[in-house]
């Protein structure tokens, strides 16, 4: 800490100002404001961050000493003011906790009660937010023995004012001889760390990470130092290196990583104007700018900054694992035991694998891959011994092109993917220890690569490893219940290693600019060649990487009731083997991207596409189902259901004669029978008919189907979606049919706000039925579009809406594709615009992906014809962009082809 820094705090000048004022508060506040400005300017000008946080601690020391001196304490008073915790370490960020301990010799606090209260009141009056405790030396011992947090704080203390001997006595009575011996302390701190990591999903890669508490954050470094302090009396990283527990390179890496996180935390506090350790979207862009990051052709400044952040915390996590493992071996091991040989290079020691000698990786570099294969083959191995982790770090520079092309290494890498268990766990270890990104440089490129959106909640490497984890979990019984079809297919794949390898490469082309699927396919081709994969295997992997988005896009954006869509997709996949692999990869990809993306309706769409495509492949691509055949088959099956329930076939025929072909193409026989039975029983003046049921009885799949039958009216769709918005229903699919008798038969698939169907909830179902019926009885009383607050996170991903309009080549409709920021009530607003433009909606595919929506609307004009006026299309686009540009960028993108 500085001894003198008059620009930050001039003691003489401050005391002179105190003497001129009746109250000291103004002088203190002025000094605090000035110091904050000085320190912020120093930060912006690039001052060394370690000096900066020490400067702030030094300034607060001086302020506290001056405040302490405002009160009369006798020279021999047994009372002292101590800094504890982070402040005790001499580290203070702009709004860090200022933790104080007022330490007394005696348990009797009464004699000092009044001056202590006045001292603390002064601190609050001058704007210092302090956390304080008042304890005697004996009370410190009692509290420290009972509370891990208290003993941790007391270990880091400095005397600010008063006699030093009180602190020394406190340290003596709270030492390991009296409480918290190093073994007990280590176990408690390690458990505390695991609990903290679990709070942040056990990943360094959260979208809005906590720079202090997340895995790889500042708290992990502090945990290392706390354990070292309790075991060895070591004060800092440099001292820990001096004791031989850290190599010089490891110390340098931890120190530089700590300083980077200090910069981020300092900037966070400065921008937030409060204690804020969450790297929220609100601050990420500005911090990237403060730290000097700029956009380039391939990446935004924020993506470059966050990639640096993720790589830093990954390095900290790696070293933290190593050091904690070392502490565990030293502190907890009661008996070294006799190592059990695995082979000439590795042995098992206390359940952990270790190299048999320090030269293993130098003499046999292939052992750097072999160790992970051995752990996959022997799941009883708990992990890697600390010294062997260190040896891996020291020798990983040997991974070069010769290493990558060595047949022993390529064979070992493929062997890992053929292991029945442990693939994900050991790929994650390889990534943690820096081996995976060196062996596959293309993977190294995506380590820490974020995507600035809410759709992808993990970095590319974390998402990739999560995908492999999901593939592996499909073989677990508890997971197979949620994903029955994917689990069944996964179990019968002829070569499961190929799906794992495709998963490893599916997003590897991201962050370079260009189409990541095409770039990844090139890398996958090179990988297969280098690893001597059979030609068919390699072609399948490359095909999967190149086309890994196609099935998801088809299911969510195409009309799966159209036989031509199924036929085209069946032609695309070509055979059932490709279909099986692509389906499983798609399911795992969606779940590994963002758990909230996988909902029951997406599950149903993918199952439907898979099942219909499989049926088409078995029938033969040369024998596609035509429209007439599908209509005839649906009508025959539906009529059979109705007749068996006692319905008059003549009544059915009369009803169906007005419905048109599209109705029977877009509904199942079961739904047609359900609709027809209810319509035929509906009184002539019964008002709107609203039917509600689940689309499937399969758990974890489907949605809630709402069928509405009523006389057609101009504003029917707009009124319906506005009413559903009021009912807090998320629309995921809309099928709009108008009969020749001018009745509308609309089917909506809805989910609740948690992504599930309404289920067996009679009260909720009745509320929905009543709400829709009332709205449709009084269409002129247009439901108010609820003005809901746009969620905080969505505000930071605004972009200009994009509208594409073109006429369908096969059907007499106009296709309007919308890509826009998500916002509450979006579909209700679109419905109102369609009403204003006198447009009819024939069909809709609704998809919300993170912070954006990708919706497709099939529309016609007032005469049920495709749009033909370019000027009308332009006006429609402008209206949509204007309506949806609130809280997003102005402008918009229009593409019209009519």
From Swiss-Prot:
Pfam families: ACT, GlnD_UR_UTase, HD, NTP_transf_2. CDD domains: ACT_ACR-UUR-like_2 (cd04899), ACT_UUR-like_1 (cd04900), HDc (cd00077), NT_GlnE_GlnD_like (cd05401). Residues 342-704 are annotated as: Uridylyl-removing. Keywords: Hydrolase, Magnesium, Multifunctional enzyme, Nucleotidyltransferase, Repeat, Transferase. SMART domains: HDc (SM00471). The keyword Manganese does not apply. Its cofactor is Mg(2+). Has four distinct domains: an N-terminal nucleotidyltransferase (NT) domain responsible for UTase activity, a central HD domain that encodes UR activity, and two C-terminal ACT domains that seem to have a role in glutamine sensing. This is Bifunctional uridylyltransferase/uridylyl-removing enzyme. It comes from Pseudomonas syringae pv. tomato (strain ATCC BAA-871 / DC3000). The gene is glnD.
